[in-house]
């Protein structure tokens, strides 16, 4: 019985139109592209769309800083993004923008349906307002002192030191991140999406069994803490879509951004005559998958399905989340040259190298992927050049010189060929479940077997013996046949290498003809299929990245008219007395254990030795220390008489001291040699 092709729509998260594509973005787009290319090889009806996320305050402010319109800024970003994705052979059927007529119409339609169905509420809220810039300030554009732990220079929605969340109104000494002025409080009517009304549906969706276990578990935590109404409006000035019937009110960027998936697909539908409703209507039998990063799971697993449900559209079949990219075990860094832009990479290295390396490490779990530069060079050269391509080159020469490019009319080892083709469904299952690392492992194991076969048959020896022409042709043809099977399996990962292999083989690499050998087939002249990756290419990428970072810093210094309250060195705090200082009991503590708190993006948990007892302390320095275990054994300075604080993850019994501006720019304070745990700082 013939199986009907599946109808599938795939999206990637929308890159923000306020910056360049980097290798972190490329993890997701390569992951999705491999899956899409595999589905095409299997004969399924699949569409692959994306778009730029083109709205929001940061775009408005950056355009103003550059002296251009927001429309000009996002147009350039879109052109750059399309160029970079094409450079990595990402096979989108359409790449659009959320600042489009399709998105404007769909956003208004969905909002009006939600409103008509009673899911939009309004209430007057108090907000911080920048009187100099004449604008309300989003949470991330306010900074001040944390109301809980008193840490300075914290954002308006959460503290990076103690991980507390709060309202910008609660900040101590708030200031505008736009102008540096002290904001005032103003009231404004805002519109809210009634997310709690969808709790039952969301719980049922979570229990469907299709979501990744990490997402399902995280959603359960959110249910337990209680769903809240979601503010979907922003006040003018704002770059985005105006809310119908609400003067000077705009949709929050995260309201219209996911609708951008629908808008990009609608744009494709109108251009190619595809039925939009076949994929988006309630009750659709098409499959809908979103590939996203773990940082935006909240929006895609709660708000987005609820919005769709409330407006009469179908929900996603699944949401596939992945982790972050680290480089050599650390967070991507501009100063170290590891915050690598896609365009910088493409200036020096074949994109297929990165596609292969990511595939060799990607699985179906939400895990960070380490891009180890030394391992990158070794793996590409070992697997692709030394094993895979060499299999073709070491046999093609004999076929060309001795047999005019014609393959044998029989298989030299039918059992071995059957063993290779028998793995087709297992490898397909690995691709289907996004366990690319297992697929690559299986393919490379077969590649080793193919090379072992050639080593044992030794065609270079057979070629010197008289009367063994048929054997030589059969052995070398077998090597070419095995290469064809391997390249068929790798075609979703290495599309350009597959194209060159197809030109050499003079045959299309298809999943449905893997079992059909090219008996008596004539090959094209063999040309080099792939070049070795050299360390100097990696060095060039790193150096160019450093240079770009340095140039950007220099340009920023030139354009900065004057230091703001955010960029200047912080003034010395209010004078205190010696009696005030004496209240602080600061101690030297030895780190016995340090580990990341999985449920937090910012916290590390420390177990500290204070000489006569141990303590647990949580510290918001996760972004600065990617390998917390390396802190074990170090001496740190802590405030020992700070009242214990109950946090979500346990009790924090003190505060560890660090210096810096926050985020990844934090540095633990330590003591000189000779100190012991428990010593008092005087």
Curated annotation (Swiss-Prot):
GO terms for cellular component: cytosol. It is found in: Cytoplasm. It comes from the Bacteria. SUPFAM superfamilies: Anticodon-binding domain of a subclass of class I aminoacyl-tRNA synthetases, Methionyl-tRNA synthetase (MetRS), Zn-domain, Nucleic acid-binding proteins, Nucleotidylyl transferase. It catalyses: tRNA(Met) + L-methionine + ATP = L-methionyl-tRNA(Met) + AMP + diphosphate. This is Methionine--tRNA ligase. A motif ('KMSKS' region) lies at residues 331-335. PROSITE patterns: AA_TRNA_LIGASE_I, TRBD. Binds 1 zinc ion per subunit. Is required not only for elongation of protein synthesis but also for the initiation of all mRNA translation through initiator tRNA(fMet) aminoacylation. Its cofactor is Zn(2+). The gene is metG. Belongs to the class-I aminoacyl-tRNA synthetase family. MetG type 1 subfamily. One of its GO terms (biological process) is methionyl-tRNA aminoacylation. Its EC number is 6.1.1.10.
């Amino acid at each position: 019985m013939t199986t009907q092709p599946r109808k599938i729509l795939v999206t990637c998260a929308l890159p923000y139109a306020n910056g360049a594509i980097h290798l972190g973005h490329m993890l997701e787009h390569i992951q999705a592209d491999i899956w899409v290319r595999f589905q095409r090889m299997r004969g399924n009806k699949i569409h692959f769309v994306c778009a730029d996320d083109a709205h929001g305050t940061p775009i408005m402010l950056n355009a103003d800083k550059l002296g251009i319109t927001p429309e000009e800024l996002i147009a350039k970003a879109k052109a750059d993004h399309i160029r970079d994705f094409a450079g990595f052979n990402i096979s989108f059927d359409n790449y659009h923008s959320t600042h489009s007529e399709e998105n404007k119409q769909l956003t208004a339609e969905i909002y009006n349906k939600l409103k008509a169905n009673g899911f939009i509420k309004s209430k007057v809220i108090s907000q911080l307002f920048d009187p100099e810039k004449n604008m309300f300030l989003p949470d991330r554009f306010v900074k001040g002192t944390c109301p809980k732990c008193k840490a300075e220079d914290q954002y308006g929605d959460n503290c990076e030191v103690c991980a507390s969340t709060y309202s910008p109104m609660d900040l101590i000494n708030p200031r505008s991140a736009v102008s540096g002025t002290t904001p005032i409080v103003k009231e404004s009517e805002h519109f809210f999406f009634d997310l709690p009304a969808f709790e039952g549906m969301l719980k049922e969706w979570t229990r469907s069994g299709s979501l990744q276990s990490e997402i399902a578990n995280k959603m359960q935590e959110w249910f337990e803490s209680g769903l809240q109404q979601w503010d979907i409006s922003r006040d003018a000035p704002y770059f985005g879509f105006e809310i119908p019937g609400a003067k000077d009110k705009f949709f929050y960027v995260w309201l219209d951004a996911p609708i951008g998936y629908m808008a990009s697909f609608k744009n494709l539908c109108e251009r190619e005559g595809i039925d939009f409703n076949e994929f988006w209507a309630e009750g659709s039998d098409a499959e809908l998958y979103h590939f996203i990063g773990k940082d935006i799971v909240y929006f895609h697993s709660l708000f987005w399905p609820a919005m769709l449900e409330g407006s009469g559209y179908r929900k996603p079949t699944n949401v596939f989340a992945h982790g972050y990219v680290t480089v050599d075990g650390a967070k991507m860094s501009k100063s170290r040259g590891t915050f690598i832009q896609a365009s910088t990479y493409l200036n020096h290295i074949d994109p297929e190298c990165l596609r292969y390396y990511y595939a060799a490490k990607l699985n179906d779990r939400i895990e960070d992927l380490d891009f180890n530069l030394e391992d990158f060079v070794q793996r590409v050269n070992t697997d692709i050049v030394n094993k895979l391509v060499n299999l073709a080159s070491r046999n093609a020469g004999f076929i060309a010189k001795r047999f005019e490019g014609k393959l044998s009319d029989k298989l030299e080892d039918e059992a071995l060929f059957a063993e290779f083709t028998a793995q087709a469904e297992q490898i397909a299952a690995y691709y289907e479940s996004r366990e690319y690392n297992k697929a690559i492992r299986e393919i490379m194991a077969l590649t080793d077997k193919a090379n072992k076969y050639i080593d044992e048959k030794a065609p270079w020896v057979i070629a010197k013996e008289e009367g063994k022409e048929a054997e030589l042709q059969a052995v070398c043809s077998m090597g070419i046949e095995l290469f064809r099977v391997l390249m068929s399996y790798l075609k979703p990962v290495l599309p350009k290498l597959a194209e060159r292999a197809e030109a050499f083989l003079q045959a299309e690499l298809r999943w449905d003809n893997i079992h059909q050998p090219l008996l008596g087939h004539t090959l094209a002249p063999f040309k080099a299929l792939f070049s070795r990756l050299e360390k100097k290419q990696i060095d060039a990428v790193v150096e160019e990245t450093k240079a770009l970072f340095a140039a950007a810093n220099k340009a920023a210094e030139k354009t900065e008219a004057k230091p703001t309250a955010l960029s200047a060195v912080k003034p010395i705090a209010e004078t205190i007395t010696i009696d005030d200082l004496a209240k602080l009991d600061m101690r030297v503590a030895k780190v016995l254990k340090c580990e990341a708190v999985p449920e937090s993006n910012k916290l590390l948990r420390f177990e500290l030795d204070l000489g006569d007892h141990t303590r647990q302390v949580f510290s918001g320095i996760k972004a600065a220390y990617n390998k917390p275990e390396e802190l074990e054994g170090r001496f740190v300075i802590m405030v020992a008489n700070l009242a214990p604080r109950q946090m979500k993850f346990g009790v924090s019994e003190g505060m560890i001291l660090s210096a810096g501006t926050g985020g990844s720019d934090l540095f633990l304070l330590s003591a000189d040699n000779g100190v012991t745990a428990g010593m008092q700082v005087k």
